[in-house]
């Protein structure tokens, strides 16, 4: 193939845009030295001894453990702590290139060792990231979590997941860039370490092959939003091949490098290789061209690199890079200096080469010198930290700042100097602010220094300089790192109570410790003189954040000096946040009553005497110790000994790990010795006194109590550009209130008069129903000169008694984003980050104050009293009301008529830069981001400018537009939709963008900055951008787009209108044009700008997805799916929490398997995946499916931190504990002598996936931490794993004790909850998870269909990685196929030998599998399950895993095991089919859960005994009709896909029974079975179905369970469609399903989906059901509920009494009535949506 490149000859200008450097302007040796040292401050992992500073320590030592790897090492990216391998490997390559080109400079300056150290350090890390040929880990750390915390690297506590690319989920750009780094490193390290260089080279070759074979970045997703590979991967393929050629001299690589040149980035709309952008982490083609030019001497490459360097120097093709007034070549606001200095390096390297034209050598060199000198300070200030004149002192860098308080403002200075760091650089006008929050101009990064180092090496060769001899960054601490503050709470004649706070503000380096303790010294002379012993002192604590107080201990007996030991061992204290770096204890020391205590002679009393109660001072007389080493304070004298006492020794027990299966007794592992720690007491905080000012005139809070306000502060920094008060309004009265009568006032100081904007990001009542008004007070008062008035539209509805509005998320800001100071604001309570009553946020009904206290001195609103009627005071007129509300423009403005010729402008006054931010052609939102450039010579008033974006509307609808953010102010941007008089190619509409006068003047050579625009149709139906005139799909970065036209005074001055459009007038070079005025623009939105905040990142808010469209061509049932899908995703419905986790139900008072509605289950997550798979089928949008899987993986699959599974013996997987019929037989004793079998899966899975971690969902999660256990037992974080069922098949949900999966003995009794379930001599801290196999199988089933449908659409590549995850989940799901203790099938004696492998496999999907282990990783265990219910089987998933090439698991036996399981499952159904056709219960391999002998005559299935209710028995598991519908739907799908005859026969009989029992009533209602009654048993299975004449079923109760109705209909539809494919069409089954769908839809729709009334007679068990607790056992729930013998269900769940539905339930119980509720269960809504889509897919509009 012949490839033609188009090059345009450059134009050389005569004026140099830069200031020439003076020879030897700076000490380049010192600059080079420090620029290299910068990388020492970025090092992650265990630091080597050659590091030259004392403030960096080991960090991120667990990186990679989530995948069973050591991924420690490398560099942190910037001022954060994520390891992004794309910019990191680019940096590694650039440093090696510097050493390759300018080795002499490094040798002469003494810096060669230091740069080679860094090259070796980073490439060693890359080797770790490449554990096998086609696996590469490209990122460690989560950008969102990392950026949400501000603190030093050494004490990070957040999860740091690792992300990989593979053959099926590739990332060619990052893999090839890493190959380049390793190849380049192999060259420069060859002399120093030839063995390591050879290793690097081999990895480079393998990685290059990986990148080249895959040629895709589809798997490179985790870095999106941070380091997207915008330029693609072909530039990296060339770049890496060049370095491999240089390393190997193998011409094959040179050929490869040249072959990809044709694919390098092009100038938009042309075939010209891009020459404008800089060589950087994303785009390395300019560097590749330079090296290819030097290697080949070909003109092609010379011209590429010279056009680039010409553009950056004298100009090329009439264009030149922008220069600042002081001479910086300025490319972009982000890292302007990194681009300029890297281009300088390329200029140096190319000008050094003999092939560079003589006339250009000096030009390029002088350019390079000027840019480096600019960075070093030629303008009067240095941009390199720690170098030169006026250098940056406050870079945006967490570890250098070293905050202990998770705050950019604490401390107010940087504790460390980040020597050598090149900051981002100035704006285009040379402006620069040295501020920690200025991450645009003042952040640093590895890639910023990457080209800078090489350029400095060249400057050193040119001009010399003297590195500082033996330079090290050894610092003297600027503050006390550890100290104690103390004060007196109270004192009396015989006691003193001390309030003490231990502080860890360490920074040299920062360190976390859980071994702090202090000594409080006392003189006991008075006590001893009175005849008492020191041991008669009494010690007690009040508020305690984790200390153990003991003593007294002798210090100096001759002087009667003793000390009290306050030991925080076990409590982690680290410089990572307000509640992390300090811990408080309040302890009392009391002598006997008649002893007169004299505090004045106590050594530790010296500094605290006279301190007012509640206050503290720093005191050196209370010494502090870290692991017995004194780190603070002074001890009294030296006459005594100072041992660190051990008051009591805890013996080392033998651990007894326990599992948490659902629902079954807890299994245990072989014990390993583990220390049992003393649990940390739960703190009881003291309340903060509230000061109530006396106002004048008096404003009295309401006493009528109609409403009150709950407040949560979501911005804890006092200095901030955004205030975030989140609110809930509570109706505390007895009658409903119309919310449109209610207003709320938030009082604050504006701190600089500006226009302001407010918005509700999300509100349960609907954000669009919330209004805002800013009101300026007539005169300022203490704490306020403004208030924000929050009101409600009529759509907010009525607020019922005892209810609240739900969360209302509010934020407001000044339009110029300047800061507020909240510190003195009346309504702000810094510490109230969770909801509580705030009386300083006032509430009004009809303008009358009914809640709270207005600030003193305001003219108060009227107040409400029980007797007086008050006339409301009118609200003052607000000074600013910029509330953003999107306003649609349904009626288009006609196109103005003018001259019928459209000629591109030649006047050149302005041009438009465009970036496309929506690359999908089919979308419901168009996102053109723009910049307007003044390319003329005089300023332009932007109010005269309009822009037109031309497109096709694709279905006439009202439309809305908004600017989310604009540098000129989003409120200054206007919009108007204009319909063309007749359609033309590419357009029937244009969006006209205009500017208000506030946008100001646009100066010559300047641009407006970014204007972020999006528009949509008001019904959110789709556009098809594919044929739109203005849309350029590939232009995702800014470039000139002449199809976006621009006008001044209505005259076309830029771009080309579509052919045939009635054009605007145009400007030509000579005639004078009378412009046609454009009608005044009609704004369609008054937007609120939302740039990144300057202090802290925006917190996560409730998910607010873009409303989905109804795709064109859908019939009635597809439209139903879309309607319900939107209801489920509408935040106002309440199906998800703010993290995107689906609740079990919208309603909270509900008790089923989860005992609270806002828990969730793996079942809900599996339905979530299924719902979004169907959404992808109907819309072609697979992003929602991916989000569902990502959320599932993030929250429901335990992470590496959640499951430290490091020590597991598959030959002894667990210790036996029997199951018992009823809870009162528990705890179950461990029996160590009972044999258990071998686990045959473990080694195979570890070998396949390289990890000991399990990949399956735990079944139960406390989404919002309702119980209070927290994630991994921290007590506070939401989304925590919990468990309930533990004690045999008779333990109903009403008899469970909810407990944490992460057991640290913090709650429950002394052994946590373990000794309720397992009897042992000793108990150890441990974790336990339980998998519900039917849920994992459903997620796999759904993913199979997603795969099929995505392939039909040609979009399989979008979800291929998720199909791989489903296959992996299926690999691990095989544990459900094995007996609990791996006993052979038919085992009827617990003492019989265990299985030796697959002889323990029953191949069915059992009730659960479970795994667990010690918190410290010392031991682990796994179990299967002996009990299998037909309702858990999933032949559809089994078939996919056994037969589908994309779904087959990777392990050697995975697919074959699933093939056996598929056959066994179908036999299981046939064995259990009753004479009538319904399916009976299941089978067990462990009779009574203890491997007892089967009763005589029991039917068997492959040696397993028939069990009517093989799972739970209260109520009997197979009395519930739901299992029939759920399970047979999967059989029907399997039949539809395969035509399997056994499945068809099974279904034919089952469907016949269904038709006979479903009721379609004449009044339009329906009923399906709800409760079944069983008799008899099946015949023993011999491979043939006998008809089971002795197994019978009766329907004993009916209902309208909507979710099960949907699942039943789904089964009927797939069966019917299968009969149409493979036999005689059962249209009756289809019609029955359709009738059920139609009746359900007609009868039960509501505002949140579909719901039917449910009578809940079982709810009396809230009050009556005793939860069995053994006599004498006592403990506590996290909220303080006492657990003891005799407690009822509600006694240990007292928080239910706060539920809004509790009064209704309680009233019904007291009156003897059966309460009735409506529920919106997440799984049921999904089932209903899915079945409607199933009808659409299978039968269309029939």
Swiss-Prot record:
Region (Disordered) residue spans: 634-703, 855-906, 1059-1113
Pro residues: compositionally biased ranges: 652-670, 680-698, 1066-1108
Region (Catalytic 1): 24-476
Single GO biological process annotation from the record: cellulose catabolic process
Record PANTHER family: ENDO-1,4-BETA-GLUCANASE (PTHR22298)
Role summary: The N-terminal domain of CelA codes for an endoglucanase activity on carboxymethylcellulose. The C-terminal domain probably acts synergistically to hydrolyze crystalline cellulose.
Stated name of the protein: Endoglucanase A
Organism: Caldicellulosiruptor saccharolyticus
């Amino acid at each position: 193939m012949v490839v033609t490149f188009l090059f345009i000859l450059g134009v050389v200008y005569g004026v140099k845009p830069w200031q020439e450097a003076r020879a030897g302007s700076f000490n380049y040796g010192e600059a080079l030295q420090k620029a290299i040292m910068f990388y020492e401050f970025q090092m992650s992992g265990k630091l080597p001894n050659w590091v030259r500073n004392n403030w960096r320590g080991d960090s991120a030592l667990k990186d990679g453990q989530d995948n069973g790897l050591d991924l420690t090492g490398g560099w942190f990216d910037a001022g954060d702590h994520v390891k992004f391998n794309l910019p990191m490997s680019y940096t590694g390559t650039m440093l090696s290139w510097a050493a390759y080109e300018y080795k002499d400079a490094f040798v002469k300056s003494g810096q060669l060792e230091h740069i080679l150290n860094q090259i070796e350090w980073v490439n060693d890390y890359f080797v770790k990231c490449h554990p096998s040929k086609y696996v590469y880990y490209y990122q460690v750390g989560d950008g969102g979590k990392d950026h949400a915390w501000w603190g030093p690297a050494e004490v990070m506590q957040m999860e740091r997941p690792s992300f990989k690319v593979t053959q099926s989920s590739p990332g060619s750009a990052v893999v090839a860039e890493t190959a380049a780094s390793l190849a380049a490193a192999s060259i420069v390290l060859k002399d120093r370490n030839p063995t390591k260089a050879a290793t690097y080279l081999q990895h480079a070759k393998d990685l290059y092959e990986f990148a080249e074979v895959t040629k895709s970045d589809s798997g490179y997703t985790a870095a999106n939003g941070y380091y997207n590979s915008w330029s693609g991967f072909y530039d990296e393929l060339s770049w890496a091949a060049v370095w491999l050629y240089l390393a190997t001299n193998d011409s094959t690589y040179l050929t490869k490098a040249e072959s990809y040149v044709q694919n390098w980035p092009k100038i938009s709309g042309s075939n010209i290789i891009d020459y404008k952008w800089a060589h950087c982490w994303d785009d390395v083609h300019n560097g590749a061209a330079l090296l290819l030019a030097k290697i080949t001497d070909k003109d092609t490459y010379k011209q590429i690199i010279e056009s680039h360097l010409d553009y950056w120097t004298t100009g090329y093709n009439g264009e030149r890079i922008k220069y600042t007034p002081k001479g910086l070549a300025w490319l972009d606001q982000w890292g302007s200096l990194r681009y300029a200095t890297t281009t300088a390096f390329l200029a140096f390297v190319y000008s050094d080469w003999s092939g560079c034209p003589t006339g250009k050598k000096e030009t390029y060199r002088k350019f390079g010198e000027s840019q480096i000198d600019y960075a070093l300070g030629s303008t009067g200030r240095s941009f390199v930290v720690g170098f030169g004149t006026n250098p940056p002192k406050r870079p945006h860098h967490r570890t250098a700042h070293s905050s202990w308080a998770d705050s950019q403002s604490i401390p107010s200075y940087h504790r460390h100097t980040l020597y050598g760091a090149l900051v981002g650089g100035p704006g285009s006008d040379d402006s620069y602010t040295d501020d920690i929050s200025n991450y645009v101009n003042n952040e640093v990064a590895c890639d910023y220094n990457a080209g800078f180092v090489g350029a400095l090496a060249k400057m050193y060769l040119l001009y010399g300089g003297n590195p500082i001899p033996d330079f090290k960054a050894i610092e003297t601490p600027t503050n006390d790192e550890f100290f104690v503050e103390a004060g007196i709470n109270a004192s009396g004649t015989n006691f003193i109570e001390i309030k003490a706070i231990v502080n860890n503000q360490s920074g040299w380096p920062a360190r976390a410790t859980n071994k702090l303790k202090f000594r409080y010294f006392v003189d006991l002379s008075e006590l001893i003189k009175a005849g008492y012993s020191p041991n008669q002192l009494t010690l007690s604590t009040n508020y305690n954040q984790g200390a153990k107080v003991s003593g007294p201990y002798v210090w100096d007996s001759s002087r009667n000096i003793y000390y009290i030991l306050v030991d925080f061992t076990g409590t982690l204290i680290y410089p990572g946040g307000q509640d992390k770096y300090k811990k408080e204890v309040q302890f009392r020391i009391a002598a006997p009553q008649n002893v007169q205590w004299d505090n004045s002679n106590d050594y530790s009393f010296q500094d605290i005497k006279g301190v007012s109660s509640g206050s503290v001072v720093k005191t050196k007389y209370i010494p502090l110790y870290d692991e017995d080493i004194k780190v603070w304070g002074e001890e009294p004298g030296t006459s005594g000994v100072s041992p660190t006492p051990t008051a009591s020794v805890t013996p080392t027990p033998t651990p007894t790990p326990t599992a948490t299966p659902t629902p079954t007794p807890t299994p245990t592992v072989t014990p390993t010795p583990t220390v049992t720690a003393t649990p940390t007491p739960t703190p009881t905080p003291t309340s903060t006194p509230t000061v109530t000012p006396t106002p004048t005139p008096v404003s009295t809070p309401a006493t009528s109590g109609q409403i009150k306000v709950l407040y949560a502060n979501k911005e804890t920094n006092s200095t901030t550009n955004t205030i975030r008060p989140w609110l809930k309004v509570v109706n505390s009265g007895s009658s409903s209130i119309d919310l449109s009568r209610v207003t709320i006032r938030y009082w604050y100081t504006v701190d600089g008069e500006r226009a302001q904007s407010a918005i509700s990001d999300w509100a349960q009542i609907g954000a669009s129903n919330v209004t805002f008004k800013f009101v300026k007070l007539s005169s300022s008062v203490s704490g306020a000169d403004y208030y924000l008035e929050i009101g409600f539209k009529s759509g907010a509805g009525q607020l019922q008694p005892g209810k609240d509005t739900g969360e209302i998320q509010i934020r407001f800001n000044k339009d110029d984003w300047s800061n507020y100071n909240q510190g003195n604001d009346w309504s702000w309570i810094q510490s109230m980050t969770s909801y509580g009553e705030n009386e300083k946020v006032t509430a009004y009904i009809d303008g009358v104050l009914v809640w709270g206290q207005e600030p003193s001195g305001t003219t108060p609103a009227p107040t409400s009293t029980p007797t007086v009627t008050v006339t409301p005071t009118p609200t003052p007129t607000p000074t600013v009301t910029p509330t953003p509300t999107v306003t649609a423009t349904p009626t288009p403005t006609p196109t103005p008529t003018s001259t019928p010729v459209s000629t591109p402008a030649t006047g050149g006054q302005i041009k438009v830069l465009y970036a496309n931010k929506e690359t999908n052609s089919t979308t419901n939102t168009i996102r053109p981001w723009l910049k307007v450039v003044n390319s003329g010579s005089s300023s332009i008033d932007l109010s005269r400018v309009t822009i037109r974006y031309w497109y096709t509307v694709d279905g006439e609808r009202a439309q809305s537009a908004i600017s989310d953010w604009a540098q000129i102010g989003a409120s200054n941007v206007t919009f108007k939709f204009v319909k063309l008089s007749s359609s033309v190619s590419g357009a029937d509409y244009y969006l006209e963008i205009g500017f208000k006068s506030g946008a100001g003047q646009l100066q010559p050579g300047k641009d407006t900055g970014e204007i972020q625009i999006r528009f949509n149709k008001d019904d959110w139906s789709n556009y098809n951008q594919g044929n739109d005139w203005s849309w350029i799909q590939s232009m995702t970065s800014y470039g000139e787009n002449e199809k976006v036209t621009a006008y001044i005074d209505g005259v076309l001055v830029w771009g080309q209108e579509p052919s045939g459009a009635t054009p605007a007038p145009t400007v030509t070079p000579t005639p004078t044009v009378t412009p046609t005025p454009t009608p005044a623009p009609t704004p369609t939105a008054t937007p609120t700008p939302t740039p990144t905040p300057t202090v802290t990142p925006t917190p996560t808010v409730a998910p607010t997805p873009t409303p989905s469209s109804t795709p064109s061509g859908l019939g009635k049932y597809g439209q139903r799916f879309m309607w319900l899908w939107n209801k489920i995703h509408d935040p106002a419905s309440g199906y998800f929490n703010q993290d995107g986790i689906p609740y079990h139900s919208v309603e909270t008072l509900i008790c089923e398997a989860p005992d609270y509605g806002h828990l969730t289950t793996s079942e809900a997550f599996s339905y979530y995946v299924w719902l979004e798979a169907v959404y992808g089928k109907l819309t072609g949008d697979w992003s929602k499916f991916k989000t569902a899987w990502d959320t599932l993986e993030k929250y429901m699959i335990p992470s590496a931190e959640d499951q430290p599974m490091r020590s597991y013996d598959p030959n002894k997987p667990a210790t036996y504990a029997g199951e018992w019929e009823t809870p009162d037989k528990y705890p179950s004793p461990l029996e160590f002598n009972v044999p258990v079998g071998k686990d045959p899966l473990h080694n195979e899975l570890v070998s396949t996936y390289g990890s000991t971690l399990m990949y399956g969902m735990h079944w139960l999660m406390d989404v919002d931490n309702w119980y209070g256990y927290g994630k991994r037992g921290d007590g506070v974080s939401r989304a925590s794993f919990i468990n309930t069922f533990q004690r045999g098949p008779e333990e109903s949900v009403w008899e469970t004790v909810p407990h944490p999966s992460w057991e640290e003995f913090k709650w429950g009794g002394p052994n946590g909850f373990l000794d309720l379930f397992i009897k042992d001599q000793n108990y150890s801290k441990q974790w336990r998870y339980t998998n519900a196999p039917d849920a994992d199988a459903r997620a796999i089933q759904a993913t199979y269909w997603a795969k099929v449908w995505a392939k039909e659409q040609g979009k399989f590549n979008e979800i291929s990685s998720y199909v791989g995850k489903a296959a992996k989940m299926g690999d691990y799901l095989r544990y459900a196929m094995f007996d609990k203790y791996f006993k052979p099938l038919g085992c009827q004696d617990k003492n019989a030998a265990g299985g030796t492998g697959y002889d323990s496999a029953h191949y069915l999907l059992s009730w659960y599998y479970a795994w667990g282990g010690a918190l410290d990783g010392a031991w682990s265990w796994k179990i299967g399950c002996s009990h299998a219910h037909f309702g858990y089987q999933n032949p559809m998933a089994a078939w996919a895993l056994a037969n589908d090439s994309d779904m087959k698991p990777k392990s050697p036996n995975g697919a074959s095991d699933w093939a056996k399981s598929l056959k066994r499952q179908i036999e299981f159904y046939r064995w259990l089919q009753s004479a009538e056709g319904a399916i009976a219960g299941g089978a067990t391999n462990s009779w009574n859960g203890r491997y007892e002998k089967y009763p005589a005559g029991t039917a068997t299935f492959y040696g397993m005994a028939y069990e009517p209710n093989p799972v739970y028995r209260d109520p009997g598991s197979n009395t519930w009709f739901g299992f029939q519908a759920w399970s047979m739907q999967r059989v029907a799908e399997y039949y539809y896909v395969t035509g399997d005859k056994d499945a068809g026969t099974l279904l034919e009989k089952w469907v016949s029974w269904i038709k006979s029992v479903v009721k379609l009533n004449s009044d339009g209602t329906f009923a399906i079975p709800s409760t079944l009654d069983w008799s008899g048993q099946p015949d023993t299975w011999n491979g043939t179905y006998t008809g089971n004449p002795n197994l019978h079923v009766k329907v004993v109760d009916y209902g309208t369970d909507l979710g099960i109705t949907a699942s039943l209909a789904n089964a009927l539809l797939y069966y019917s469609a299968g009969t149409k494919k493979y036999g005689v069409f059962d249209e009756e089954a289809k019609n029955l399903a359709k009738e059920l769908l139609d009746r359900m839809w007609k009868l039960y729709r509501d505002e949140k989906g579909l719901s039917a009334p449910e009578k809940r007679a079982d709810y009396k068990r809230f009050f009556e059901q005793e939860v069995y607790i053994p006599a004498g056992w006592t403990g506590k729930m996290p909220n303080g509920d006492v657990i003891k013998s005799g407690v009822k269900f509600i006694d240990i769940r007292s928080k239910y009494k706060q539920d809004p539905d509790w009064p209704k339930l309680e009233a019904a119980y007291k009156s003897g009535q059966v309460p009735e509720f409506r529920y919106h269960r997440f799984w049921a809504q999904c089932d209903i949506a899915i079945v409607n889509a199933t009808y659409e897919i299978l039968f269309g509009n029939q």
